[in-house]
């Protein structure tokens, strides 16, 4: 039930993001910049360290973590990590 609610809430955001992209010009300028943007996102995604469950290990906010994880500062490492916060929240 929660998953359905999350999907319903995210659908307008996903659609809005796809509609914001500009169409390509005849000279291909937008196509080149879009490709560069995709390349930057791909490089960032390769830098993400994942835990065994496939969720990100490090974070800067709760939105960087999986749904049941929370972004917490770990004094021993000096970094913020996504930590499991439990099934009932």
Curated annotation (Swiss-Prot):
<protein>
    <recommendedName>
        <fullName>Teretoxin Tan6.8</fullName>
    </recommendedName>
</protein>
<feature type="signal peptide">
    <location>
        <begin position="1"/>
        <end position="21"/>
    </location>
</feature>
<keyword id="KW-0964">Secreted</keyword>
<feature type="region of interest" description="Disordered">
    <location>
        <begin position="22"/>
        <end position="42"/>
    </location>
</feature>
<dbReference type="GO" id="GO:0005576">
    <property type="term" value="C:extracellular region"/>
</dbReference>
<keyword id="KW-0165">Cleavage on pair of basic residues</keyword>
<feature type="propeptide">
    <location>
        <begin position="22"/>
        <end position="44"/>
    </location>
</feature>
<dbReference type="GO" id="GO:0090729">
    <property type="term" value="F:toxin activity"/>
</dbReference>
<keyword id="KW-0800">Toxin</keyword>
<keyword id="KW-0732">Signal</keyword>
<keyword id="KW-1015">Disulfide bond</keyword>
